[in-house]
Amino acid sequence: MTTLFDYLLWRGDLPLSADPFHEVDGVILARFTYMPFHRVLRRDSLTPTTVEAVCRALLALPDIETAVRRRGDTDLLRALVESPRYKGMELTAYADRLDAESQTQFSAITVKLEEGHYCVAYRGTDNTLIGWKEDFNMGFVCPVPGQKLAVDYLQRAARRLPGRLTVCGHSKGGNFAVYAAAFCGDEIQDRIEAVYNYDGPGFDSKVLSEPGYQRICQKIQTFVPQSSVVGMLLGHEEKYIIVHSEQTFLQQHDTYSWEVRQKHFHYLDTVDNSSRFVDYTLKAWLAQMTPAQREQFVDAIYEVMRQTNAHTLHQMNENWLASAASILKSAKNMDEETRQAVTHAAGLLLSSAKDGLLRVVLEQEAEKGE
């Protein structure tokens, strides 16, 4: 199967003047945002640094293999260094914020693609518990702090940089990209050529009905793999494009697993049954709870995980035995009101899962009868 690495081999020598920026370029930059830029870049610096220089600096780090998030990240750095299409692009305004008190995890960077054309790229969820907590907060509050920061970042970039804009991001970064484009203002929206959302969650009906969202909707391109979970959360007014991934279920969230055909992904007609099941289950589950109930459930789970004293999911996995013991102890020590809230939410989830499974089975039977 051909992936973005094959694309870099085939098309990595073509300048944007010969082959304009498109969806595969966007996913490469969205993936690039996850690199540990804090090791080699000054935050908020407006001094341009080329992609090649940043990649070389990262590859020179003695611990780069463990500093990156995905196995393919160092391969991407090496490929970008050798790519005439990308290596001359300039990076500015690296932003990175992690705040436990406001439960905010936000990072973005601006890429000068060519003269008069810039890409604002947002990072998705990192490995921190705070980052995941902000994700879950989206289920009961909007905007979360990261979404507000995303709007502010895009507005500042647009004021500073003349010309065309492209906005992109993966996972929560895709959600931030769409939210920022929807609420940045009409003048900036007119300069936006495309918004690329790679398997990022959607929004509640209030956001989807906002004039700013409706105005930018036709420029949004949302891509989800066939077993998408994250990208199917909440609502999407824009049409989403289903792409083929060689991985299974949650592993399909990894864009390195997406199949690329020349300058497009390999498109599919529909998501698979597992994605439909999760979609039906979670939407029904959330619909049965008030925002306050969702918040109480999420806060309770987060507090239990926080008692492990781990700051990242990786730390929890490394010390899984101690983490499990701490989680069990914290769960036992829940006050009665919280325990009842968690039990109630878990019961609703189980009921929604049963209904979701039945709905998928009935749909399959109906398809066979056609």
Regions found by a protein language model. Name each.
Residues 1-118, 122-164, 185-370:
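Alpha/beta hydrolase fold serine-hydrolase catalytic domain that processes acyl esters and thioesters
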Residues 168-173, 177:
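Gly/Ala-rich beta-loop-alpha elbow adjacent to hydrolase catalytic centers
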Residues 177-186:
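Short glycine-enriched nucleophile-adjacent loop
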